[in-house]
A protein has these predicted regions:
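Histidine-acidic metal/acid-base catalytic patches
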Residues: 27, 44-66, 70-151
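Active-site acidic/histidine proton-transfer and metal-coordination neighborhood
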Residues: 1-63, 73
Length: 151
């Protein structure tokens, strides 16, 4: 399928699902992946395309899982995107960029990003989705300490 047909198929299928989800109080979450490093050939690899799909479906029960790791690789401009589309985001994943390790080993200032997003009214969850380079307990302890710096 070319991109336009793939987009139409995705929107059509999600529209059918969304009407069922609305009746049951379920929210569908779409995640875009990066195709530069981890998922070559994946269709949904751009944050703006993901928002386009959500807008075309037109349901409050279809939202974006914004994986900051993937979207920093694909598009950058993380905070601007998050603030512009906060009402379309249902969940956020955090990992260090590059390498997908602990967030404190990253080119991004996660405490600042998280605090700005909370200040803008985001009340959803932030999930840690990374490959630890440290032993699990040490990794989590250092990550939580680092992320709490913005509070």
């Amino acid at each position: 399928l070319d991109r336009d047909h793939a987009m139409d198929a995705m929107v059509g299928t999600l529209s059918e699902c969304a009407s069922k989800c609305e009746k049951r109080g379920i929210t569908l979450i779409l995640e875009a992946f990066n195709t530069k490093v981890d998922h070559p050939g994946y269709f949904l690899d751009d944050p703006e395309t993901t928002i386009e799909v959500i807008d075309r479906v037109g349901s409050s029960k279809v939202k974006m899982l914004y994986d900051i790791y993937h979207m920093q690789i694909m598009a950058g401009d993380i905070l601007t995107f998050l603030l512009q589309h906060k009402d379309s985001i249902g969940h956020i994943h955090i990992a260090g960029v590059p390498g997908r390790a602990e967030p404190f080993n990253s080119e991004l200032n996660y405490p600042y990003i998280i605090q700005e997003f909370i200040n803008a009214g985001y009340s959803g969850a932030f999930g840690l989705e990374y490959f630890p380079e440290l032993p699990d307990q040490e990794s989590l302890t250092k990550t939580l300490l680092y992320l709490s710096q913005g509070k």
